[in-house]
């Protein structure tokens, strides 16, 4: 259990050799979920995007492809994730369309009302207090801006419960729990979609 716990705990804050391996797996393993989640953005044309908990950078790259006129800021509190995400999106960084930096979702150091879209793929499990973090997201979104959350766990599936027991600090939230915290943080027009065959959930909230 010691090795397994250490390995899967890399999903929370990747570091070292195991973290590098995990980040590579996450880019591949989360791709289908992220693409499904992005499919819920068909009516949105953001110019300024922030990705929260960017991991190794694959989803940031896909968002930049989806929105060729947008600029994106990607943050993660893992220095290794920031390094790998910057490598993955090197060309976009060079063109001036992408920035990757270390950041803390509980204390977002960005101008208020500056983003049209915020995304969080497979990350809120580890956020230190949803209402506080969601309020930080609301603060930096423009009025009418959107917040997209995508999770592989709906808070009730067996796999999610298993990983909660392995990874310290991981919480798999139900859609209702997420919706309630979003409302408390000031979001409205909250739409939840549950995958028909998997425990995946996508929640899209508007400020």
What do the predicted segments below correspond to?
Residues 2-6, 15-27, 146-204:
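C-terminal alpha-helical "lid/dimerization" subdomain adjacent to the S-adenosyl-L-methionine
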Residues 12:
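S-adenosyl-L-methionine
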Residues 27-47:
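Conserved alpha-helix/loop element of class I SAM-dependent methyltransferases that forms part
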Residues 48-107:
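Class I SAM-dependent methyltransferase SAM/SAH-binding core
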Residues 106-117:
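A short acidic, Gly/Pro-enriched loop at the edge of an enzyme's catalytic core
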Residues 117-130:
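A short SAM/SAH-binding and catalytic strip from SAM-dependent methyltransferases
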Residues 131-143:
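A short glycine-rich, Lys/Arg-flanked "PGG" loop and its adjoining helix->strand segment in the class I
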